[in-house]
């Protein structure tokens, strides 16, 4: 019985033949994404824009009615609230965005919290307030700064790791691919004005991890083939390496997609942004590994000599003395 193969063994797609137009498309998409970020801006959630969090417990209900709570709070005019269970199933966290002037005024913020609590207590007899916190604009600004530092540190550490493990050209290629993936994710959030919260930072870090893993698999095969086929042209060798790892790439992507699509289509609204980000990252991460990370190696002059140990000056002198050079 033959096993089903998504990618035949003799697959030979000339990926690098179209490296220039596809790389140009990548650059244009990056530019468009950042243009959207700077013109439309990101729709920051409570974590990054400031707001109010109310924590409560339903004393006589096994599971907190998250959907109904979201609808109830939305009628109060606080925008699109984020309602999530935490701890036990009957415990809930309700987060709403507040205008900057309200968030900065403790009394006004407390009045908003009281408004939410009184409305929900009138609707649910077993609604018990556990506490509430006001996230000011200053604190949310610190969150944004910390998140930015985390992303930059992750990308810097990754570039250094690739540089040490392979060659500096590989580090540049991997870093560009990651920048491509993060940029397109931010562009999607700016275009559709999806809420940008700490959950999305976690999603972006997951995207970076997936894209990096895919890139390293291809890079590792490229390194092996550079040592094995020393006379082969680099573009042809890169095509060979990508085709040899294509089955693994397709299988990994499809497996993740099978897990993500049900969450994207039928999951709770509170997870939609995070799942959408990871789903997009799945596609752009695969694309960038092939059409961004690999072509850069050609333009930066990677050859089979890149992985041949350099001879010392003494060895070169000895070869010259023997007339071998």
Regions found by a protein language model. Give the residues of each.
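A structural signal for conserved, well-ordered secondary-structure elements
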Residues: 1-325
């Amino acid at each position: 019985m033959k096993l089903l193969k998504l990618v035949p063994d003799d697959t030979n797609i000339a990926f690098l033949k179209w490296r220039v137009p596809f790389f140009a498309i990548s650059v244009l998409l990056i530019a468009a994404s950042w243009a959207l970020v700077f013109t439309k801006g990101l729709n920051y959630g409570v974590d990054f824009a400031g707001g109010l969090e109310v924590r409560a417990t339903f004393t006589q209900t096994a599971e907190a009615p998250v959907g109904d709570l979201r609808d109830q709070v939305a009628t109060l005019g606080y925008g699109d609230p984020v309602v999530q269970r935490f701890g036990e199933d009957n415990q809930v966290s309700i987060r709403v965005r507040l205008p900057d002037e309200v968030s900065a005024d403790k009394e006004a913020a407390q009045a908003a919290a009281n408004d939410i609590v009184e409305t929900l207590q009138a609707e649910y007899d077993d609604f018990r307030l556990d506490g509430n916190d006001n996230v000011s604009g200053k604190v949310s600004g610190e969150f944004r700064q910390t998140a930015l530092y985390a992303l930059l540190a992750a990308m810097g550490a990754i570039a250094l790791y690739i540089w040490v493990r392979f060659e500096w050209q590989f580090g540049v290629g991997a870093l560009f691919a990651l920048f491509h993936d993060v940029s397109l994710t931010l562009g999607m959030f700016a275009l559709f004005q999806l809420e940008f919260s700490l959950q999305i930072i976690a999603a972006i870090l997951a995207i970076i991890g997936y894209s990096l893993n895919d890139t390293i698999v291809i890079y590792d095969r490229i390194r092996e083939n550079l040592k094995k086929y020393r006379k082969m042209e680099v573009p042809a060798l890169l095509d060979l390496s990508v085709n040899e790892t294509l089955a693994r790439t397709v299988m990994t992507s499809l497996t993740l997609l099978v897990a993500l699509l049900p969450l994207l289509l039928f999951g709770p609204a509170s997870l939609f942004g995070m799942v959408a980000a990871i789903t997009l990252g799945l596609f752009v991460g695969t694309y960038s590994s092939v059409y961004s990370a690999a072509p850069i190696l050609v333009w930066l002059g990677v050859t089979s000599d890149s992985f041949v140990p350099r001879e010392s000056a003494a060895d070169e002198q000895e070869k010259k003395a023997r007339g071998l050079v």
